[in-house]
Amino acid sequence: MDKQSKIILISGPTASGKSNFAVKIAKKIEGEIINADSMQVYKKLKILTARPNKQEQKNIKHHLYGFVDLNEKFSTGQWLELTIKKIENIQKKKKIPILVGGTGLYFQSLINGLVKIPEIPLKFRNKVRLMSKKEGQKKFYKKLLKLDPKIKDKFDPNDTQRSIRAYEIKSYTNISMYDWLAKTKSEFNDSDFLKLHIDTKREKLVEKINLRTSSMLNNGAISEVKKFLKLKIKKDQSVNKVIGIAELTQYLNDEITLDEAEELISIKTRQYAKRQATWARTRMTSWIKVDPIKLDGYIKKLKKSSLKLDQLT
């Protein structure tokens, strides 16, 4: 693999302006963009997933957007395999790969490699989740420490999702999650990446989320959900997690008003952004925090030859 140039990674919460930032960088340094958002891989649902539109993709090559059938399951492992190939092809053309998205697990798999943990049955996982809910996070975390002492000080004790994952892995495989992680191997070195995280203040992000929700509803989201419902997608498909489907379905069934649907979509999006922020705070500590107000200034400092941002703070 040609590793003469760095690979740029751009993360940030939903509605933070990642896609636009990536396009501007790509124009400046002759880059091509690779999707790192688990919902934007699906066909259809362009509006609800906030997939870059034709104008945004104009003159800049975009990869791994809107190519997975809605009825297909698409794993992190599949994304990683395709992404590595895309990176290789882009670098062969002497261009810069720019990965942009909000799916932390995708970035983690690229940087650290993918953990080859055996698939844990859904019934078993649901049992652990129910236990977590009944116990409460504080009590559940203490129980996790007894089961797997190796996880102590490895992550925030208030991180519910990570606690659940650690518990189900240890209890099902009898091997600590961190022993599994130790077995992983990445195709890359950490020095191969320039990792940028758009660090948006919560008040500003809430404002942007509300504006984007309103824009989606005014630009075809309802029609998009009507078409989606006609496809009769299985309920266990990941695409059903796209924010807006459930809420607009309720509206179309006359269960709630459009204003109520809009508010619910905004609330759920804010909750998702909060989870993304927690991931970034606990698992992206080495990433460069980029002030969204100063994005254009950072782009001016970016040079293809060195791919370093000077005076970031």
UniProtKB/Swiss-Prot annotation:
Asked whether the UniProt record includes Glycoprotein among its keywords, one would answer no
Catalytic activity field: adenosine(37) in tRNA + dimethylallyl diphosphate = N(6)-dimethylallyladenosine(37) in tRNA + diphosphate
* Residues marked Interaction with substrate tRNA (site): T103, R125
UniProt entry keywords in alphabetical sequence: ATP-binding, Magnesium, Nucleotide-binding, Transferase, tRNA processing
The record's listing under Pfam families reads: IPPT
A GO BP term here is:
tRNA modification
Which cofactors?
Mg(2+)
Q: What is its EC number?
A: 2.5.1.75
Which residues of this UniProt protein bind substrate?
T14, A15, S16, G17, K18, S19
- Which SUPFAM superfamilies does the entry mention? P-loop containing nucleoside triphosphate hydrolases
The entry's ATP-binding residues are G12, P13, T14, A15, S16, G17, K18, S19
Record's keyword annotation contains Transferase: yes
Q: Name one GO molecular function term.
A: tRNA dimethylallyltransferase activity
**Gene3D superfamilies (alphabetical):** 1.10.20.140, P-loop containing nucleotide triphosphate hydrolases
- Judging by the UniProt lineage, the source's domain of life is Bacteria
Q: Where does the record place the region Interaction with substrate tRNA?
A: 37-40, 161-165
Q: Which HAMAP family match?
A: IPP_trans
The family annotation for this protein states: Belongs to the IPP transferase family.
What's this chain's function?
A: Catalyzes the transfer of a dimethylallyl group onto the adenine at position 37 in tRNAs that read codons beginning with uridine, leading to the formation of N6-(dimethylallyl)adenosine (i(6)A).
Q: How does it assemble?
A: Monomer.
In terms of NCBIfam families, this protein maps to:
miaA
What's this protein's name?
tRNA dimethylallyltransferase
Q: Which organism is it from?
A: Pelagibacter ubique (strain HTCC1062)
- This chain is encoded by the gene named miaA
